[in-house]
Each structure stands twice: as structure tokens, then as C-alpha cells.
């Protein structure tokens, strides 16, 4: 069964902007748009190089139990402008009901303007498995062992 994420708009949000949507039939992520407060819509938000900003979407969501929403960067913004998410993927738990915002970071050399209505991120709805944790005396051996970063080679 396809999960349904329930959505409400903030009182101040621009109802003319579309809800999150998938651009293609095979898309994994639904696009999220910047829904700026009325006083910021004309000028947008300017993100300085190495700066961070919390961009409002004007939405609150109810995620079905057993699922999460992952907020991920848009590849075009990352490649063309250096715009990404510092906590990628950002996790939204099913019991969160607060405002949905997207933290953007500008890793580029130039200021970047976020305009009202811009597609700023993708949200992926994913199932969650909550594991149990057990304290043990030792861990099973593997071929890799404790080899960490780069231990499996570079090619």
C-alpha cells in the first residue's frame, strides 16, 4: 500500500504554491519549494558563501507511523551553485508535527538568491526499522575487521 503523508499549510503560507510533488513517474524524491513569509517574497533570501539559512516551506506534515521523511539536496543546485544541505539527509520522524524547514548551505564562491517558490530540496518517504541493541562481550570476525576510512582501497 502506498503511504500517504498528510499536509497542512501554515496560516501565512502562499496557497498558490504546489504541495510537494514528484516531477517524473520514476522520481524517488518529491520537490519541496521555498514558501517565504509575505514580507520576504519580493526580495527572497540571499545566502552568502559558506552561509546557512533555514528556508521555510510553509508546510507541516504527518508522516505515517513506520516511515520517515528524508530531506535531500537537489543535484542541480549542488552542481551549478554549490547549494547543499549540511545535515544531508535530514531526518523527519513520524511523530514530529512542527514547521517543515530546509537548512541550506552555500558552498559556492558567490552569493545565492533563494526566490519564493524555488524548488530547494527533495523529500524521500522511507520505511523505518527500529533495531534492538544488545551489549555483548565481543563481535563476530569479518575479513574487513576494524579497517576504516579508505581501508578497502581506492579503485
Swiss-Prot record:
CDD domains for the chain: trimeric_dUTPase (cd07557)
GO molecular function terms noted in the UniProt entry: dUTP diphosphatase activity; magnesium ion binding
Q: Which residue ranges does UniProt annotate as crossing the membrane?
A: none
Q: What is the reaction catalyzed?
A: dUTP + H2O = dUMP + diphosphate + H(+)
GO annotations under biological process?
A: dUMP biosynthetic process; dUTP catabolic process
Keyword Hydrolase recorded: yes
Q: What is the required cofactor set for this protein? A: Mg(2+)
From what superkingdom does this record's organism come?
A: Bacteria
Q: Which residues bind substrate?
A: 74-76, 87, 91-93
| One Pfam entry name | dUTPase
InterPro entries hit by this protein: dUTPase, dUTPase-like, dUTPase-like_sf, dUTPase_trimeric
Q: In which pathway does it act?
A: Pyrimidine metabolism; dUMP biosynthesis; dUMP from dCTP (dUTP route): step 2/2
What EC designation does it have? 3.6.1.23
* Keyword terms of this UniProt record: Hydrolase, Magnesium, Metal-binding, Nucleotide metabolism
Protein's job = This enzyme is involved in nucleotide metabolism: it produces dUMP, the immediate precursor of thymidine nucleotides and it decreases the intracellular concentration of dUTP so that uracil cannot be incorporated into DNA.
Q: Which family does it belong to?
A: Belongs to the dUTPase family.
Q: Which NCBIfam families match?
A: dut, PRK00601.1
Spell out the protein name for this chain: Deoxyuridine 5'-triphosphate nucleotidohydrolase
Organism classification: Bacteria, Pseudomonadati, Pseudomonadota, Alphaproteobacteria, Rhodobacterales
Amino acid at each position: 500500500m502506498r503511504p500517504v503523508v498528510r499536509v497542512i499549510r501554515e496560516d501565512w503560507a502562499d496557497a498558490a504554491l504546489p504541495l510537494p510533488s514528484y516531477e517524473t513517474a520514476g522520481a524517488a524524491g518529491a520537490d519541496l519549494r521555498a514558501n517565504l513569509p509575505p514580507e520576504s517574497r519580493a526580495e527572497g533570501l540571499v545566502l552568502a558563501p559558506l552561509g546557512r539559512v533555514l528556508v521555510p516551506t510553509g508546510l507541516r506534515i504527518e508522516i505515517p507511523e513506520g516511515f520517515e521523511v528524508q530531506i535531500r539536496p537537489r543535484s542541480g543546485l549542488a552542481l551549478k551553485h554549490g547549494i547543499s544541505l549540511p545535515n544531508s539527509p535530514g531526518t523527519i520522524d513520524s511523530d514530529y508535527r512542527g514547521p517543515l524547514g530546509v537548512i541550506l548551505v552555500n558552498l559556492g564562491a558567490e552569493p545565492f538568491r533563494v526566490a519564493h517558490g524555488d524548488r530547494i530540496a527533495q523529500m524521500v518517504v522511507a520505511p523505518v526499522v527500529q533495531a534492538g541493541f544488545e551489549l555483548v562481550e565481543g563481535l563476530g570476525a569479518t575479513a574487513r575487521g576494524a579497517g576504516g576510512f579508505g581501508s578497502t582501497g581506492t579503485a
